UniProtKB/Swiss-Prot annotation:
Domain GLUE N-terminal: 1-88
Annotated ranges, domain GLUE C-terminal: 105-138
Protein name, per record: Vacuolar protein-sorting-associated protein 36
Origin species: Homo sapiens (Human)
Keyword entries, A-Z: Coiled coil, Cytoplasm, Endosome, Lipid-binding, Membrane, Nucleus, Protein transport, Transcription, Transcription regulation, Transport
Outcome when changing V67A: Reduces affinity for ubiquitin up to 10-fold
Length: 386
């Protein structure tokens, strides 16, 4: 902790903000200290920590002071952490929260998640070393320490050791890649054989497809799901998480909405999305918050709330006038319809069918007969035969 210096938190000239995350606690080695709830900012030059309650409490450390970083997984009652190993403090260091420390590393505890994306972006900055190409003001230059990530190796022995480490890392990556590829090929082969079997039976008409084969085929399709679902561990628990989730929802719901006439109830969306996400289940609250951002992000979907409180997702191209005109035409053909009868005719849920009929009634195209037999809708003759 003696590597940190007090700062205003303002970015210097040529310094750019990369990512930030709330709810981060700092450990001095394994020891808990008073800095337990703050916002951690990563710039091209520094790690900056600002207290969430007292914004005047702000400190920073140069990325050039970092030797290397590593991840520490979450445990029972413990948050995931990033361990940051540091060079010794320079002799001309400016004042900070600690003048000395026995530890050569700190831990960043992410109580509100987001550590995966933060670790990735920090690793990128340590690799690219942009602080070397974009010098900033003298106030930061004076605190520049030894260059991180470099192994002090002299002569042929050092070169050989470095080459050996690089070779081992390459071998490990290749082995893992081929192992994953083998598993993928086995699964793909099973899917191809099953698909051919079903297609041949349909083509040759040599018998019905058994129920077991249908279930197996559907399970393969569902297991494909979303390849990389948006999670709190990746994007944290704030607005960024809901924005990324909204973009992913727009991608996976486009085709199902087109197949269902351009509209789906939020309950249907919830079931469909969680089925595709597999183990990474989504809470109803997160789904609603993400759907509220669809229109603001100019995505092809939008959230709509009917007067009854029913929430639906619909395509931006879905027109209310066409929906009402279609409902009026169907009811006029049959003379009168209940919500259940209308739902069977148009192939949608009873909930959405009722909302469509109520909307047509609100616009004056239909009228109702609410009796002991239930709610029945009729064409409004005052409008159609005027």
């Amino acid at each position: 902790m003696d590597r940190f210096v007090w700062t205003s938190g303002l970015l210097e000239i040529n310094e750019t903000l990369v990512i930030q995350q709330r709810g981060v606690r700092i450990y001095d080695g394994e020891e808990k200290i008073k800095f337990d709830a703050g916002t951690l900012l990563l710039s091209t030059h520094r790690l900056i920590w600002r207290d969430q309650k007292n914004h005047e409490c702000c400190m920073a450390i140069l990325l050039s002071q970092i030797v290397f970083i590593e991840e520490q997984a979450a445990g029972i009652g413990k948050s995931a952490k990033i361990v940051v190993h540091l060079h010794p403090a320079p002799p001309n260091k400016e004042p900070g929260p600690f003048q000395s420390s026995k530890n050569s590393y700190i831990k960043l505890s992410f109580k509100e998640h987001g550590q995966i994306e933060f670790y990735r972006r920090l690793s990128e900055e340590m690799t690219q070393r942009r602080w070397e190409n974009m010098p900033v003001s003298q106030s930061l230059q004076t605190n520049r320490g030894p260059q991180p990530g470099r192994i002090r190796a002299v002569g042929i022995v050092g070169i050989e050791r470095k080459l050996e480490e690089k070779r081992k890392e390459t071998d490990k990556n290749i082995s893992e890649a081929f192992e994953d590829l083998s598993k993928l090929m086995i699964k793909a082969k099973e899917m191809v054989e099953l698909s051919k079997s079903i297609a041949n039976k349909i083509k040759d008409k040599q018998g019905d497809i058994t129920e077991d084969e249908t279930i197996r085929f559907k399970s393969y399709l569902l297991s494909m799901g979303i390849a990389n679902p948006v999670t709190r561990e990746t994007y944290g628990s704030g607005t960024q998480y809901h924005m990324q989730l909204a973009k992913q929802l727009a991608g996976i719901l486009q085709v199902p909405l087109e197949e269902r006439g351009g509209i789906m109830s939020l309950t249907e969306v919830y079931c469909l999305v969680n089925r595709a996400r597999g183990m990474e289940l989504l809470s109803p609250e997160d789904l609603v918050n993400a759907c509220k951002m669809l229109e603001a992000l100019k995505l092809p979907l939008r959230l709509r709330v009917f007067d009854s409180g029913v929430m639906v997702i619909e395509l931006q191209s879905h027109k209310e006038e066409e929906m009402v005109a279609s409902a009026l035409e169907t009811v006029s053909e049959k003379g009168s319809l209940t919500s259940e009868e209308f739902a069977k005719l148009v192939g949608m849920s009873v909930l959405l069918a009722k909302e469509r009929l109520l909307l047509a009634e609100k616009m004056g195209h239909l009228c109702r007969d609410d009796s002991v037999e239930g709610l029945r809708f009729y064409p409004n003759l005052f409008m159609t035969q005027s």
